[in-house]
């Protein structure tokens, strides 16, 4: 699939089939992510492929966080379990932190480009993803589970990867709403 078609086919998916994505597709997507532009050649992105054991620990933490906000019934808990366990892969994406706040901002933009490249590469192989940045990505226990030093790296998202259920139809703004010649 050419790049433009992959860009147009890329979608954020919220529900995944319980079907495995090949490691070759994942590795190709990481290679694509690593081609992202970055100012000053900092290459600030890091990707962690989360094992099932670690994913179960993160799932337990997600339920714990949810229970602090409100009671959840068995059905809601099953939906959370499906969300965490059905995707083929969970990648945790982090950014190497720089002491200079301007460089940190540039590096976040570079990490965003890397995630977009990853998503487009996956889409070119008929695989979908979701970049999530919820409370669990900022929780100190997540850093402990994944063994990330929060003084050196910041988790900027979970990337859920897999084959999608119920592909969404997106209505995008018209080009004249987002683009002007001046």
Task: Indicate where each model-derived feature is located.
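N-terminal amphipathic, basic helical "cap/leader" segment at the start of enzyme domains
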Residues: 1-87, 182
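Short, surface-exposed loop/helix-turn segments at secondary-structure junctions
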Residues: 62-72, 102-106, 144-147
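C-terminal helix-cap and adjacent tail motif
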Residues: 3-12, 151-182
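Small-aliphatic-rich amphipathic alpha-helix that forms the alpha element of a beta-alpha
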Residues: 33, 91, 97-145
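Arginine/glycine-rich "motif VI" loop of SF2 helicases in the C-terminal RecA-like domain
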Residues: 39, 123-124, 151
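Structural motif
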Residues: 88-91, 157
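Short, charged/polar surface micro-motifs in flexible loops or helix N-caps
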Residues: 52-57, 63-64, 97-99, 140, ...
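Short beta-strand segments
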Residues: 93-94, 160
């Amino acid at each position: 699939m050419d790049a433009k078609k992959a860009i147009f086919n890329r979608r954020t998916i919220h529900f995944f089939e319980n079907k495995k994505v090949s490691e070759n597709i994942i590795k190709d997507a990481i290679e694509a992510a690593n081609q992202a532009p970055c100012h000053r050649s900092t290459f600030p992105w890091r990707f962690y492929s989360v094992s099932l054991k670690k994913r179960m620990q993160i799932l337990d933490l997600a339920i714990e966080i949810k229970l602090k906000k409100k009671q959840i019934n068995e059905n809601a808990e099953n939906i959370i379990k499906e969300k965490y366990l059905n995707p083929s892969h969970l990648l945790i994406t982090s950014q190497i932190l720089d002491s200079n706040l301007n460089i940190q901002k540039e590096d976040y933009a570079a990490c965003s480009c890397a995630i977009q490249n990853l998503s487009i590469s996956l889409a070119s192989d008929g695989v979908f993803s979701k970049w999530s940045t919820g409370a669990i990505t900022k929780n100190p226990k997540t850093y402990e589970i994944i063994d990330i030093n929060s003084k050196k790296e910041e988790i900027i998202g979970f990337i859920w990867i897999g084959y999608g259920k119920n592909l969404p139809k997106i209505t995008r703004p018209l080009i004249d709403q987002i683009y002007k010649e001046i």
